[in-house]
Amino acid sequence: MSRVNTMHQWKERLRDRARTASFGRFLWRRFLDDRLFQAAASLAYTTVFALVPLAIVVFGVLSAFPAFNEWKDALTDFIFNNFVPGAARSVQNYLNRSLEDLGKFTVAGMVALVASLLITLHSIEQTFNSIWRVAAARPKVTRFLIYWTVLTLGTMLAAASMAMAAYVFALPLFRTTEGQWLAEFAWRLAPMAVEFVCIVLIYRVVPQHAVRLRHALPGALLAVILMEIVKWGFGFYLGNFQTYQRIYGALSALPILLLWIYLSWVSVLLGASLASSMSAFRYQPEAMRLPPGFEIYGLLRLLGRFRQARLHGNGLDEDRILALEPMLTDTLMQELLCELKRIRLLRRDERSNWLLARDLDVVPLAELYESCQLRVPVEDRPLPCRDDPYGQAAAAALEQLRQPLRSVLAQPVGDLYTHLPGDPP
């Protein structure tokens, strides 16, 4: 092996180590910034109140289709047998009684139940938007349609999947010894597969952000692993320690269910944070990083890109923006885009591309400075991509902004008070 190839391999290894270490630090910061444990506690509390209305919607959808009626009990048993701790199974009886008494509910009661369900779904969407650093939520009508589609289609797909599985496993192939072993193995694997598919769909559908499948899959895998660990831990504790029953008595199912929902949300949100971090992370060498305080340089370059795209009658999606401006992090890009949208300088089209909404020739720099609340740095720092046309234009504008400040900021602070009256005796 030549010396040149050896040097190249060592450089790649060092770069990979630096990339891995950088991603580890980035992931840890995102975990801390997302405050996932507080968010999981809030979602667990609202989820408990949404269980009854959720069950009403789910089984109401199944009741609307006579073909799925026979699968209601099977679906309920499958959920509680595989996803709920045994000590909290008494909740199943409560839900069944609530569904039997559905006809006795008043209009006000039904409105309250539906409102609690919508509040829970809205809280879930807000949490996921926060994890993916999305500032603008969906319009209310679009949000409601997505909620309703997920609940109805999800329920129908779950029932159809169980019916299909029952049909397949009833074939003569699965009546043999090997076939029965395979069917038993598949049924044991089914809960994890259901968890994995559902979490992937949640990551892809719920946030107001384009989440790629290659980012959602590792996040969902982490969430499923954590949920299985939680299941095992719950089973071990509840099977060996009965203190909680002596403390809570007949009410022991409620705190166990609440803790179970909380830990499940922690698992899902940790997976979401991993998926978000994978989509947001971009390894930047030192020379390509935007110095702190020079965000205005990135903003001016970004607007130059939008101006050029408008001349060609095009918009820019977020992946294209990051490819054109490698010094922008995903977080900074989202912040700049949201601010520019807030002041109606940018808008999104039906394909989620960003477009200029106003002519830059009539937008003063003062509006950008005041609205985006960016500082004008006085010191000189090496700037990435400074020699290309966009960098030259942005650097020239930045120099014009800070030149008058330099002479003012160079004077001693004491000179500001020379015209004040003398100190009192």
UniProtKB/Swiss-Prot annotation:
InterPro entries for this protein: UPF0761_bac, Virul_fac_BrkB
Keyword list, A-Z: Cell inner membrane, Cell membrane, Membrane, Transmembrane, Transmembrane helix
Coiled coil ranges: none
Keyword GTP-binding: no
Domain of life from the UniProt record: Bacteria
Compartmental location: Cell inner membrane
Annotated GO CC locations: plasma membrane
Predominant localisation class: membrane
Residues spanning the membrane: 48-68, 105-125, 154-174, 182-202, 216-236, 250-270
Membrane topology, as annotated: Multi-pass membrane protein
Pfam families linked: Virul_fac_BrkB
Entry annotated with the keyword Ribonucleoprotein: no
NCBIfam families given in the database record: PRK04214.1, yihY_not_rbn
Family according to the record: Belongs to the UPF0761 family.
Descriptive protein name: UPF0761 membrane protein xcc-b100_3490
Origin species: Xanthomonas campestris pv. campestris (strain B100)
Lineage per the UniProt record: Bacteria, Pseudomonadati, Pseudomonadota, Gammaproteobacteria, Lysobacterales
